[in-house]
């Protein structure tokens, strides 16, 4: 809680095997607060945090088998890359030779061994992130906590780094819990996704489960790729790629977005409603659609997924 504001409510998360877990949601939904509670940087007002069956709720962050990689990396500018990575081992009292040996090994894991003698201001953003990642992993935590680690990177590097994170998690065999507001990031990285909103977990599942069977209108809208449609008293989700366009009809094309292999088309029905339709570039080329065209839209009943409110 922050004053009278409840940051996270009734969260029940169980991670059984080492996997990549993403906490996904809009700004202010409670995902970073939940991450900080696991790390011990925020107190919990009720419930417990258990790791390997042991309650760590009362333990200080340094006493928990977790390590946290912060959004701003928080590297020490006056220390070399090697000493940044080895810093936690120095605090634990390890000798210089031993901690440097372990730090070299960790830098090898993140492909930065050749830059061990450099300083943070000599590194690119992606290299700084790798240093922060190596520093977080040097203590051999059971759980690595990542607070929006890719948000400061350009789109190309972000895609490259998320592949490296996933491969590293598999190789190390530990659980990564990763906070993000990017749907694409969560879908690409996660074995398990928690979709959060206003301090509550709206849905938990694999990326495929979340996308194919969103539980409610919030999840369908936030994950994207769906139209949320009201038919009588019920609410349905229909995937954008399940809607078909035919020439001539009561709807009008209001926007066309070319996205490489796919094209997104927004159509309005003249009564204030709109639908977004996704087609392959080949489908779009065959129909020869243009802004302002009158078209018909349809979908099969089996492609309607009923939602809770």
Could you say what each language-model-derived stretch is?
Residues 61-215:
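ABC ATPase nucleotide-binding domains
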């Amino acid at each position: 809680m922050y004053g009278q504001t409840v940051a996270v409510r009734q969260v029940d998360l169980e991670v059984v095997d080492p996997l990549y877990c993403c906490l996904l949601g809009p700004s202010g939904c409670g995902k970073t607060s939940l991450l900080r509670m696991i790390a011990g940087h925020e107190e919990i007002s009720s419930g417990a945090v258990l790791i390997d069956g042991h309650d760590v709720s009362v333990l200080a962050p340094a006493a928990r088998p977790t390590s946290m990689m912060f959004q701003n990396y928080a590297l020490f500018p006056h220390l070399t890359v090697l000493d940044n990575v080895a810093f936690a081992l120095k605090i634990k009292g390890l000798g210089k030779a031993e901690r440097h040996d372990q730090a070299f090994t960790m830098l090898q894991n993140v492909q930065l061994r050749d830059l061990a003698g450099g300083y943070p201001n000599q590194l690119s953003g992606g290299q700084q992130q790798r240093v922060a990642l190596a520093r977080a992993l040097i203590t051999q935590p059971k759980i690595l906590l990542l607070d929006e680690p890719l948000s400061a990177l350009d789109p190309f590097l972000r895609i490259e780094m998320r592949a490296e994170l996933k491969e590293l998690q598999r190789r190390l065999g530990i659980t990564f819990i990763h906070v993000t507001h990017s749907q694409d990031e969560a879908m690409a990285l996660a074995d398990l996704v928690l979709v959060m909103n206003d301090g509550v977990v709206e849905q938990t599942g694999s990326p495929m489960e979340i996308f194919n069977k969103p539980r409610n209108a919030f999840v369908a809208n936030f994950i994207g790729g769906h139209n949320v449609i009201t038919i009588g008293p019920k609410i349905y989700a229909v995937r954008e790629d399940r809607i078909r366009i035919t020439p001539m009809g009561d709807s009008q094309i209001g926007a066309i977005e070319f996205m490489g292999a796919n094209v997104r088309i927004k159509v309005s029905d003249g009564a204030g409603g709109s639908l977004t339709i996704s087609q392959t570039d080949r489908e779009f080329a065959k129909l020869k659609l243009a802004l302002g065209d009158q078209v018909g839209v349809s979908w099969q009943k089996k492609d309607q997924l009923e939602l809770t409110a």
